[in-house]
Each structure stands twice: as structure tokens, then as C-alpha cells.
Amino acid sequence: MKRKLAAAIASVLFVFSPNAQTQAPATAKGPAEFRDATAAAGIKFVHNNGAYGKKYLPETLGPGVAFIDYDNDGWPDIFLVNGMDWPGHPAKHSTPKLYHNNHDGTFTDVTHKAGLDVEMFGLGVTVGDYDNDGNDDLFVTAYGQSHLFHNNGNGTFTDVTQKAGLGGVKEFSTSAAWVDYDRDGRLDLVVANYVTWSPEADLYCTMDGKSKSYCTPESYKGASIRLWHNNGDGTFSDVTKQAGLYEPTSKTLGIAVLDFDNDGWPDILISNDTQPNKLYRNNGNGTFTEKAVVAGVAFSEDGVARAGMGVDTADYDRSGNTSLLITNFSNQMISLYHNEGRGLFVDEAPRSEVGRASLLTLGFGCFFFDYDLDGWPDILVVNGHIDPDIQKVQANVKYAEPPHLFRNLGKGKFAEVTKTAGAAFAAARVGRSVAYADVYNNGRLDILMSTNGGPVSLFKNEAVGTANHSLRVKLIGTKSNRDGIGAVVRVTTAEGTQTQMLRSGSSYLSASELVLTFGVGQQSKVDAVEIRWPSGQIDKLGATNAGQTVTVTEGKGQTLARQFGK
């Protein structure tokens, strides 16, 4: 995690993108507002990071959070990753938690009933239906053995890690994503690994020359990501090397799946900590080619590898191309890489509030989402430092930090509106992961945010005065994977066309819901919906009313519609 201020100063240069769209969203009807609904929801969870004074590196990273509709009732449930005490220093029994959505704003802890009370040093999570049985499964990353939990379809899960061929691989795994990289209709698994570390190999590091501090990743050797091919029989095979993804110098914290060149094949972006980021282009034949350097996303503008943490992608300016968001260490600012086409990216952060506001904060979880439903993706970043004593050596950097909420103003510009979002939301915390879902079935995206060594927080989206509408799209694959992960959906209104890919992964250690939300402003309907499935199938809907969730089944078109609030 580089501490160099020079990288940030060098990046504060005016950058102009000729492709930035000239349209702008309508003026906001009121301030952003997110109400802390954690207590009212009945969520009682405190992350155990295992810390007891040794300052072991894994303690600083978790926990991940996920939304998963595990019982297929149309309401997103909550899964929370947890750590554990280090061997030889037990203090409490801690496990992940699964909370069932009761449809009335409350949740019930069903962890034990679901068979998920498994102790591990968990870090991240990803959600996907790997066996196409109609039930979303869980893959939980960990320091040590990660776990694959099969959803049995009756409210319970079974740990199938060993049976699936994923056992015996004990690494320092962080983020993960499901991706059908070969488009065979089955979800494959890509797993990020951080560094080569163990308690026995822990090093003594210090910031002030007096006391031990958490070591930075420069102190340890890297570790390659892994790509697991889905064999279609419940097992997976490690194809990392033959796919061209083996790179043992990487120190990966974030994974995003995207199609940056619009060729129909899912590419992979990884954010590396103190190592160059990697952008792997899918060649369409089971292999990938690394393109980050030539694309301009590997380093900062002065050629220095940043400390990449979280990552997300979106077409935030309706250019038709997918751009990148990467959070970095304090004194480095966020990276907002605009996709110029032709495989090239330009960092737009310095010319927008995104860069200026994030210069001193340490970002982790992040995503694009349209919180005010005006049709333009906004940005949320969760912040928090890794060392409680950071202010002893850097007076202007805090351990607990407020998040950043940036409203998309159009024309490539953003405005920070964090302070208008409510005192609880804007409070300083040691933030890590963050995910979104429509928890209350009202068409708005709510937020689940984690704190390292602290509680999780559920924030209900109550944007004051917002009368904007949305259309939500749920996909069911037939030839493609059941979740429709990798499908590209385009929604057209009188104000233009929005494009989203349904993706697993992104943010940091987290999984947002597998339903796409399109804000359409004051429009009461959309003119057209187009779905391009991974199989190549194209489904089209005509005029469709907003204010509902439509289910589209591959090859059949719309098969279900549910109005918000019902």
C-alpha cells in the first residue's frame, strides 16, 4: 500500500475525454437520504477480525457482505461473512450469518437452520447458481480454506467444497466472482488471492519505530488469482495456467467482470495492492491476454503501481462503453477510468470531484448505482484505514473515515453529496465492504455496509422528494447460465439508452443482488428493453411500464411482472 503523495499530486492534471456525453440528468428533487434501518431490521452482527495485539495482516481486510434471494421469494436476504479467533487465542465462537427477509422491513437469523454456522477466517463472498438448479449458491473466501455452499432449495445449504474439487487449496483469498468465461452455459469461478502469508512467517513492521504496526503487502510475496472451470458435474478444475491468468506477483483485492471491448466475451479486471492492476481480455478460446498496460489502467500517470482495493465497472455516461472505478490507498485518490473505445482508458478522476474528495481517504468497497433513479449511475465508496495508529505519523489521515457518495451530474462530472445523506450514513467508520439491493421492494436501491471489527449497517434509501421511477429486470437463463450472469441489458426511453451487464463480483469482498435496476426519471414507461444473453440469444420487449420488476426468460421474453410493493 504505497504511501507516496507524489502519485496523487502528479495525477491532479486536467484530462479531457472527447467521448463524454453532453446530456445531463435533471435537477435533483431533493437531497440524498439513507436512514439507518439496522436496528429496526433486527440485524445484530459484529465482525470478529481476530485481533488480539499481534497485528496479523488478515485482520485488516474483512468482512464481506452479500444479498442473496436464497429461497426464491423475490425478496433479497442477507449473508454476512465473519472471521474467527486465531488458534491458541480463543475468546468467542463466531460464524457467518444468514438473515431471512420477512417482507416487512425485518429479518430473522436463520444461520443455524440453514447449516451455515461454520467457523472460518472468512473474508469475501460471491453469489451464483453454479449448477443451474434454480437456487443461488454461496462461495465464501477465507484465509485458509475457502468454502462452497450448495443451496439445497429447502432453506438449507451443504458444504460441498471437497466434493467440488475445491478442497485442499489453502490460500489468502479475498474477492471472488462467478463468470461464464467460455460461454458454455455454466458458471465458472475466479478467485482473488492477496499475498503469501502465515502467522509463522509474520514480519515485524513499525510506523513510528516504537511499536508494531500492520505490515503492508510490499513485505510479502504475491499470489496468483485462480480460475476454476465448471465441469458440469458439480466439480471444478483449476485452469489458471492454461487460461493465461497465472501471475504470482499479483496481490489482488478486487475483481470485476466486464466486456470492455464489446465483443461479447467477458473480460476480467483485477485491482492489485502495490502491484500493477491487470485487465485480462477474453480471447474467446479459453485463454486471456493481459491488456492493462496498453489500456492505461495498470499504473498511475507517473508510472507507479497504486494500492488498488475495490473495483466496479459501468457505462456511467451512456457512451456505450464500460468504464472502470478503482479505490486506492490514502494519498492516492480514486481512479475513474473512462473507456475511450479502441481499448484505451483515461483517468477522469482528477477533473471531477471524485478525485479531489478522495485524496486523503482509503477506499475499499465501491460501486456504481443510481440512488436517485434519474437514469445516471452514481458512485458510492466506503472508506477506512488499516491501522488504528495512523494519525501518529500522518495527522491528516484518519483511521475511521466517512464514505463518499457522488451524484452523477452528467458530462463526466460528479458532486459529493455525502453530507446530505444523513448523519448516520455520513458517520466515520472503519469501512470495508458494501453491497446494494432493493430490500423493501419499492424500486429503490438500499445499502448494506460493513465495518472491520464492528457492526454492519443497513441503510434504507429515502431520497427526499424523489418522484423518479424505475424498472427492474430479473433474468432466467435457459441456454445461458440460470442467473443470466454476463447478459447485457439495454433500456431505452425518450431520454436515451442505458446499458448494464448482469455481473457477479465487483465492489470489495461483496455481492450485490442479481437484479438490474434502471432509473427512468419522470418517465412512466420505457420504450424498449433488449437482452443479449451469453448464448447469443437476443430477446426484446416493447413498451414496458416502470414501477415493476419484470422477469425475462431466455428465448421466451417476459414471463412475469410484479409491481413494487406487492
Segments from the language model and where they lie:
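Hydrophobic beta-strand segments that make up the repeating blades of beta-propeller
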Residues: 75-82, 133-142, 189-193, 263, ...
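Repeat-based blade/solenoid architectures
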Residues: 43-64, 92, 114-126, 166-177, ...
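Asp-box/WD-like beta-propeller blade repeats and closely related beta-sheet repeat scaffolds
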Residues: 110-130, 135, 140-181, 191-218, ...
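Bacterial N-terminal signal peptides
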Residues: 7-17
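Short, conserved, GDST-rich strand-edge loop motifs in beta-rich repeat architectures
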Residues: 81-93, 193-220, 381-398
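Beta-propeller blade termini
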Residues: 62-72, 100, 121-135, 148-150, ...
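Beta-propeller blade repeat segments, especially FG-GAP/WD-type strand-to-loop junctions
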Residues: 22-35, 89-110, 145-159, 203-206, ...
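Gly/Ser/Thr/Pro-enriched helix-cap/hinge segments flanking short amphipathic alpha-helices
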Residues: 23-26, 30-33, 51, 353-356, ...
